[in-house]
Amino acid sequence: MQYDLYVVTDEGLSRGLTHPELARRAIAGSADVIQLRDKKCDCDYLLRCAMEMREDCNKAGVTFIVNDRLDVALQSQADGVHIGQSDMPLKFARRVAPKGFIIGVSAGTVEEALRAEHDGADYIGFGPVFPTGSKADAGPVCGLDLLREVRRRVSIPVVAIGGINAANAPEVLAAGADGLAVISAVVSQEDVTAAARNLKAIISQYRLSGRQ
C-alpha cells in the first residue's frame, strides 16, 4: 500500500464542500489515501458519505479509510479504519475486522508506536509533528526528532500528521515519514485538487531524488 499523500476530509475546515466532494477533488489531485473523518455528524449521514467515497476511491484505485467508526468502515466496505489512543482497542478491531482489513493507529510517543506495532497495526499515524489547528484533540507537538526516533524503532509504515504543508513537507520526508497526512493543507484551500497535486509533486520529486 502506498501512503505518500494521505488526505483527511473535514467539512468544517472546507470551503463549503462535502466529504465526498472533497474526496473527489483530492483524488483528482493524485491522493493515495482518503480518510473520512467526522466526529460530529450523525451515523446515517456518515454512512452515506462513506458509501459514496468508497465507490469513488475504488474506481480510482485509491485506498479508503474511515476514522474511528469501525461499524461504518465495515458497512461501507472501506479498505480500513483509523483509530486513536482513546478509541476502541486495536486488538478488538483486529478480531472483528475481515482478513486484509487495514488498521491504522494514532501515536504521539515512541511507546505508543511500539505498542501499536506489537498489537497488529498496519501503519502508524504519528504526530502532531508541528502545531496544528485542524484537530482539537491532536495532543502535544512531537517534532521531527521524535518522528526520526519512531521511524528508527518500528518496522511498519509511519505516516506523519499535524501542521504539514508544502513548505515543510520535504523536511518531514527527510525525517523518515513514509507518507504525509494532511487536512487543512488540502481541504481548506480554494482549489483542493491543485493543493493535493502540488503536495504529491513535492513528494514524488523527493522520492525521485533518491534521498529516500
Swiss-Prot record:
Positions of 4-amino-2-methyl-5-(diphosphooxymethyl)pyrimidine binding: 35-39, 67, 106, 135
Swiss-Prot/TrEMBL GO biological process terms: thiamine biosynthetic process; thiamine diphosphate biosynthetic process
Pathway, per record: Cofactor biosynthesis; thiamine diphosphate biosynthesis; thiamine phosphate from 4-amino-2-methyl-5-diphosphomethylpyrimidine and 4-methyl-5-(2-phosphoethyl)-thiazole: step 1/1
Annotated catalysed reactions: 2-[(2R,5Z)-2-carboxy-4-methylthiazol-5(2H)-ylidene]ethyl phosphate + 4-amino-2-methyl-5-(diphosphooxymethyl)pyrimidine + 2 H(+) = thiamine phosphate + CO2 + diphosphate; 2-(2-carboxy-4-methylthiazol-5-yl)ethyl phosphate + 4-amino-2-methyl-5-(diphosphooxymethyl)pyrimidine + 2 H(+) = thiamine phosphate + CO2 + diphosphate; 4-methyl-5-(2-phosphooxyethyl)-thiazole + 4-amino-2-methyl-5-(diphosphooxymethyl)pyrimidine + H(+) = thiamine phosphate + diphosphate
Binding site for Mg(2+): 68, 87
The keyword Magnesium is annotated on this UniProt entry: yes
Needed co-factor(s): Mg(2+)
Superkingdom assignment: Archaea
Binding-site positions, 2-[(2R,5Z)-2-carboxy-4-methylthiazol-5(2H)-ylidene]ethyl phosphate: 132-134, 163, 183-184
Gene Ontology cellular component terms for the protein in this record: cytoplasm
Cofactor binding notes: Binds 1 Mg(2+) ion per subunit.
CDD domains: TMP_TenI
Keywords linked to the UniProt accession: Magnesium, Metal-binding, Thiamine biosynthesis, Transferase
Enzyme Commission number(s) of this protein: 2.5.1.3
GO molecular function: magnesium ion binding; thiamine-phosphate diphosphorylase activity
Matching NCBIfam families: thiE
Entry similarity comment: Belongs to the thiamine-phosphate synthase family.
Role, per record: Condenses 4-methyl-5-(beta-hydroxyethyl)thiazole monophosphate (THZ-P) and 2-methyl-4-amino-5-hydroxymethyl pyrimidine pyrophosphate (HMP-PP) to form thiamine monophosphate (TMP).
Protein name: Thiamine-phosphate synthase
The organism of origin for this protein: Methanocella arvoryzae (strain DSM 22066 / NBRC 105507 / MRE50)
Gene for this chain: thiE
